[in-house]
């Protein structure tokens, strides 16, 4: 199942989403009530999905997404939560995977999760080549030709 964090300044809304995510068997790694600690956490941890309020007080959704792109260890899917339906279009303009209207309904949450899981499955199925840097140039090697990988310190060897 996917892993997630919640970034929501409203404590009750965060708690409601936490309960729903647990019911959907999502591995909840952390809950943040401010954007800055979440961004710091994302710079050193990996997560599949970030559920974030589109209207956080310290930074708006656009700034939050831009900072994630600059600082996150791995780019997660973003699902914005909002109390206003008119913010839905804005969520997609911000390259969100989906949006959820508050109060969040279980069926709508499950639909969003199913879409993200399917999208990630398609990405995994489309993997065809390793991209390997070989003396200043990149070489693509079909994954079927790789016999094994060996990691040593900060280097990975492909055989």
What are these regions (language model features)?
Residues 1-3:
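Extreme N-terminal starter segment of soluble prokaryotic enzymes
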Residues 36-124:
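CheY-like receiver
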Residues 114-159:
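Conserved binding/recognition cores within well-folded domains
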Residues 25, 74-75, 128:
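Residue-level signal for beta-strand positions within conserved beta-sheet cores that form or flank
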Residues 17, 88, 146:
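Conserved RecA-like P-loop NTPase ATPase core
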Residues 28, 75-77, 145:
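Short acidic capping loops at alpha-helix termini that bridge into adjacent secondary structure
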Residues 10-33:
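Two-component/phosphorelay signaling modules centered on CheY-like receiver
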């Amino acid at each position: 199942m996917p892993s997630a964090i919640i970034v929501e300044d409203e404590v009750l809304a965060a708690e409601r989403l936490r309960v729903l995510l647990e019911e959907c068997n999502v591995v909840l790694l952390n809950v943040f009530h401010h954007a800055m600690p979440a961004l710091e956490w994302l710079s050193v941890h990996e997560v599949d999905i970030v559920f974030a309020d589109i209207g956080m007080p310290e930074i708006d959704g656009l700034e939050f997404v831009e900072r994630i792109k600059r600082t996150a260890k791995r780019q997660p899917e973003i699902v914005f939560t909002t109390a206003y339906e008119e913010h839905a279009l804005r969520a997609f303009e911000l390259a969100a995977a989906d949006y959820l209207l508050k109060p969040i309904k279980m069926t709508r949450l499950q639909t969003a999760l199913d879409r993200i899981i399917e999208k990630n499955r398609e990405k995994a199925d489309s993997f065809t080549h390793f991209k390997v840097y070989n003396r200043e140039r990149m070489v693509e090697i079909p994954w079927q030709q790789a016999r094994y990988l060996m990691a040593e310190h900060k280097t990975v060897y492909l055989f």
